[in-house]
Amino acid sequence: MKNLITILALTSSVLAYSQSENNELKVNILYTALGAPELSYERILSDNSAIGASLAFSIDSKDNMDLRFGLTPYYRMFFGQKKAAGFFIEANTMFINYIDSISYSSNSSPTYNMKTGFGLGAAAGAKFLTKNNLIGEIYGGLGRVFGDNSIGAYPRFGITLGKRF
């Protein structure tokens, strides 16, 4: 039994060591400063492409920010010398929950009219990678929200810091 546990431990450590670093976790410090932290996970598919998803949520009071929740899956194509780094273009979708309007009455607290939308967009930016696999990104873009809504478009911008593992 001891030998089996030792073999399993050695095998799993060798397999874990040999796997390439194709995963990234990032935080958008710009959105965080604005009261809506955005966390992202990205999976590298090849030297020049990756897929990922960003999740933003509001921690601010409803009176100061319209965004309540946003989920943004994306695909990126890279044009740099390093693996999944350098200049990139991005195609994204967004599922968004936001405050459409606020109603006030004299005898009660405000009433928030919440809406949910779906949109498609594009962005461009640059990813910088250190030898220690620390990541810095800057990007910007815009998307169109479809359906009967009041916002019409959503921004896609950020300054992110993260780690590749």
What are these regions (language model features)?
Residues 19-29, 87-93:
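Transmembrane beta-strand segments of Gram-negative outer membrane beta-barrel proteins
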Residues 42-138, 144:
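Gram-negative (and chloroplast) outer-membrane scaffold detector with strong preference
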